[in-house]
Amino acid sequence: MLIVTPKQMGRIEDRSEKLGVSKKQLMENAGKALAGAIDEYCRKDISIPEEEKSIVFLAGKGNNGGDCFAAANILVYRGYKITIINVGGQPSTELAKEMFLRLPKERIEFIDGYRSESVEAAIEAAELDYMTIPQPKELDDLARKKDRNPLDNILLQEKRRMSLVKSAIICAYVVVDGVYGTGFRDQLDKNIAGIFAIGTSAYRIAVDVPSGGNSFTGTVAFGAFEADETVTFGFMKTGMTQYPMRKYCGKMTVADIGIPAGALDVLDSDRKYYRIERNHLASFPPRRERDAYKGTFGNVLVIAGSSSMRGAAALAALGALRSGAGLVKVASVEKCIDTLSVLVPEATYLEMDCDDYGFMLFDSSKDALQKAMDSATAIVIGCGMGVTPDTMEITRFVLANAKCPVVVDADGINCIASDIDILLGKRSDVVITPHVGEMARLLNCENSMIRNNRIVAAEKYAEKYGITVVLKGAGTLIANGRMTASNHTGNAGMAVGGCGDILAGIIGSIIAQGCSVYDSACAGVYIHGLAGDAAAQKLGMESMLPRDIVDCLSDSFRLLKEKHGKKA
């Protein structure tokens, strides 16, 4: 599925207008789509008549407010009770003004939800918020107060307004957020955050994106609107694939608003963004012909493990084997191999000399390692390997001499963190699979910098070094400098040590079987998450282990084959 940045969406709309589909038509279509989603939800409960289902629109002053007005104009004629709270003040764009003027004012309740700067100052001084609004009797008592000063009058008026706003939202069947759109980048106004915080059992729908969310990065401001459903127009926005904004979107509905196909031409020279779907994996797994042999499906060399971290090597090897690799060889130390030969008898082994602490040595194993590298069609390095001068040298040697693609994970990433420019001298394609902490070490920055700019971090690093970056986490990103994909499979049960080792093995296996490096990374991430979802369904997120993900890889491949009509 194609996704776009906010800037790309703006250019697409501009191009649509030149192709004969005006922005007014796009807004009208957006209004129809929004009204359709609201109507669909409301009609699920037939025990309550339409006229008793109150729909409250929180309308901003920009085009998101215009979308609300367009939808309200449809729904009011379907019998719903419509209330519009103008949270951002009067409409400020020409399109929003036009949609507002079309509304049948006599059939709609309007509530002033806007607060001026002078009123804002008075409210702050009085420490008044939506959680402490006086009850009607208290308001009457204040109104009868004889010695009111000008500030008292402001507060009384504001308390009445806030009471109306709160009452409308509490009594609503559906609350629609159309305050801010894709251009939001700041902090939420306290008045607006207070309105969003009003407790209600209503179904909450966001227009295009939830207000308070950064639709490019996926970060959210304090007090952002948390929706049950987001109706986004034309295309999903990049920030909607990333947490925490993805959580704030709820169910995501992508509405067709009539953008002509030719409008996408403006993206021809742009970096492309996608959400990985099953149809992207139509070429994988490859068909297994009856006359195939083990060499047909690639040879994966896994350089991993140490005396104290044997499981990482085992999981990487199992991930590769369960993903269809014909041959898997593990290069590791003796104690690790002794364990793996029992856990993974299907693999072959290259014993590396080790130091007194059980980590691999380089010089004495260099020739044997080079020979193993020469016969491999993909290399996975780093899982449980440790960070020592020798493992750092091994990593540098592999990157400089490998003739096949290399997947660098875990300690392999940590081994190059102090000398990242070694990637500029790589001999073949490279995939790195960092989590946020490892990415921060690579870029020498705080973890928060990566969390708040995941897309930019992955793209810039991939572009600078000419590699594929798999930035792990909820909404894993796969970037190669020209394309960036996001993944939506997987779950919180996978937040446990060992899952990343399996992923590295899966990606290495798919590369070894002949898929392109970028496509292999995308497929590997998707399949890994799909297996995690299968494990969670069987065992629950709390009880599943990484080994269960390995066992469920067969479920992933079965689902892919069923989707594409392939024979097992």
Predicted regions and their residues:
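Internal gly/pro-rich beta-alpha loop/helix module
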Residues: Y173-V174, V179-S269
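Small-residue (G/A/S/T)-rich helix-start motifs and N-terminal tracts that mark the onset
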Residues: M1-K97, A121, L128, I170, ...
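Nucleotide and nucleotide-moiety/phosphate-recognizing core
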Residues: G36-V179, D189-V207
